[in-house]
A protein has these predicted regions:
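Transmembrane helical cores of multi-pass secondary ion antiporters/exchangers
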Residues: 1-410, 414-417, 425, 466-470, ...
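Short alpha-helix boundary/capping elements
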Residues: 398, 444, 448-452, 507-511
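Intracellular, membrane-proximal regulatory regions of polytopic membrane proteins
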Residues: 421-490, 496-498
Length: 518
């Protein structure tokens, strides 16, 4: 199949899988990987050839930039030291701990006996990058404390950059470009520091350029240039492109998406980046499923389990150590959160990009790809599917069944009130007799009274969920205002200038609500 047709087919498959996964309430990424495995096993579609340049230069920048523009600098600043501890020492320790568990045991296993420290660190860095997108989405749904969500999101974004830098340095050791640990430490701080500097400059220039713009196409173009430009410029200068894109995204999100940018343009731009991230994630998970060697995965399943538990143990050591370090300070967080930070740190797209980016000539490529794929798959299946019960067990969230029951009762109330309105309309139009209307109203009113009693008992006693309900209701009312405003413009009651000014005002209120619920 030609390259272009293969990509088109993958997008069609991703769309179908997304719809199906939503209907059966299955995490989208798990469904994509499963479909990719089936397609690869049946040889229904050959995976397009992926080079390191394609994976790094095309896939990474939008994934990193989209995550960065949604983070608030104030939230990161408030918990900067715990986040920084998880991101730099945490990722380094996690990488080393994973390698330290793998290598000694691997010496006694035929498939892993030749594994050395450089290759072990390469694997450790690949699985140190967390991808908790599905978990954070569930957090919002279940009313998990905002500070825990911020810790999870911020740490994930920033540790991606650290993991990639360590991965690159480990590869430089294997390739012979670095020879001593001292050189590695100097190289680490050089590529990270200069990468952040490049990103700040690109982000600041983009923020200045987008101020007061009223053309959404130009804003989207400029942010696209910022995402790819920050990455490519940094890479050409020999520093970290990922750290550069992280910095550019944070600056654009903080300074570019301020009150100087029209709210409607801001919302459209954010929607564009959410779509791009969705598209890139979809392709990566499908391609990983297509690229995996199932026979090798089957042969290596004990080592995949070893790799998974090594990664999990390393993760819990890091988050527990961070909790202990900050427990005596005002930055402490509950011990229960360490379980969620450890268990919710799923592995995903970035880990697979790093594994796939290794050159075909590298002797351990198939081994690392298989181990990383197995670790990602186990993390999604074991941690991804169990995070909701774990949250409930720890008392951090309301159960999903409670939330659904609450939502269903409210929906039934709405439907019954609509039915009562319909009966009233039929009576006023003399389409049914007053007696029949009264009989029907009495019947439906009894149902409403019964559901109201159930609703009082079922109301989740979680402040965050009630706050979410309020935000959602306000948003719906504001969207109704937008629709009414458009009707006034469409029928000629108001001119375009008035319509645009009032629409921006309403969009500003919607955007403020989105931030309030973020």
């Amino acid at each position: 199949v030609p390259y272009e047709i293969a990509i088109l087919i993958l997008f069609v498959i991703a769309s179908v899988v997304a719809v199906a996964a939503r209907r059966i309430d299955l995490p989208y990424t798990i469904a994509l990987m499963a479909v990719g495995i089936v397609l690869g096993a049946l040889h229904l579609l050959n995976a397009p050839h992926l080079t390191q340049e394609l994976l790094y230069d095309i896939f990474l920048p939008p994934l990193i930039f989209e995550a960065a523009i949604h983070l608030k600098a104030d939230d990161i600043r408030r918990d900067f030291w715990p986040i920084a501890t998880l991101v730099v020492p945490g990722v380094i320790l996690s990488t080393l701990a994973t390698a330290a568990v793998m290598i000694p045991i691997g010496q006694h296993l035929p498939q892993l006996h030749a594994l050395n420290w450089a290759v072990g660190i390469l694997f450790g860095a690949a699985v140190a990058a967390t991808d908790p997108v599905a978990v954070v989405a569930l957090f919002k749904k279940l009313g998990v404390p905002q500070r825990l969500r911020v810790l999870m999101e911020s740490e994930s974004l920033l540790n991606d950059g650290t993991a990639i830098v360590i991965f690159t340095i480990a590869w430089a050791f294997i390739h012979g470009d670095l020879s001593t640990p001292q050189e590695a430490v100097i190289e680490f701080f050089r590529v990270v520091g200069l990468g952040l500097l490049v990103g700040v400059i690109v982000g600041f220039l983009t923020a200045v350029a987008t101020q007061n713009l009223d053309d959404v196409m130009i804003v989207i173009t400029l942010t696209t240039v910022a995402a790819y430009g920050s990455f490519l410029i940094a890479e050409r200068l020999g520093v970290s492109g990922v750290m550069s894109t992280v910095a550019a995204g944070l600056v654009v999100g903080q300074r570019g998406f301020t009150n100087t940018l029209f709210p409607s343009i801001r919302l459209t731009t954010e929607s564009f980046w959410e779509y791009i991230a969705f598209a890139m994630n979809s392709l990566i998970f499908l391609l990983m499923g297509l690229a995996i060697d199932l026979q090798m995965l089957w042969r290596l399943w004990p080592f995949v389990l070893l790799a998974y538990f090594s990664m999990l143990v390393a993760r819990f050591i890091v988050v527990t150590g961070t909790w202990g370090l900050f427990y005596p300070t005002r930055l402490r967080f509950p011990f229960r959160w360490t379980v969620i930070l450890g268990w919710g740190g799923l592995r995903g797209a970035l880990s697979m990009v790093l594994a796939l980016s290794l050159p075909e000539s590298f002797a351990y490529k198939n081994l690392i790809v298989t181990l990383v794929f197995g670790v990602v798959l186990l993390a999604l299946l074991i941690q991804g599917l169990s995070i909701s019960p774990v949250l409930r067990w720890l008392g951090i969230s309301t159960s999903l069944s409670e939330v659904r029951s609450y939502e269903q009762l409210k929906t039934r109330i709405t439907l019954l009130h609509n039915t009562m309105d319909a009966i009233d309309r039929l009576r006023r139009r003399h389409m049914i007799s007053a007696r029949s209307a009264q009989t029907l109203e009495d019947e439906f009113q009894k149902q409403i009274d019964g559901i109201l009693q159930e609703l009082q008992k079922a109301t989740p006693d979680k402040e965050a969920l009630l706050k979410e309900e309020l935000i959602r209701t306000k948003r719906r009312l504001l969207m109704d205002q937008k629709n009414d405003l458009f009707e006034l413009y469409r029928n000629g009651t108001i001119d375009y200038g008035t319509y645009e000014a009032l629409k921006n005002e309403i969009d500003g209120q919607i955007f403020a609500l989105e931030n309030e619920g973020a």
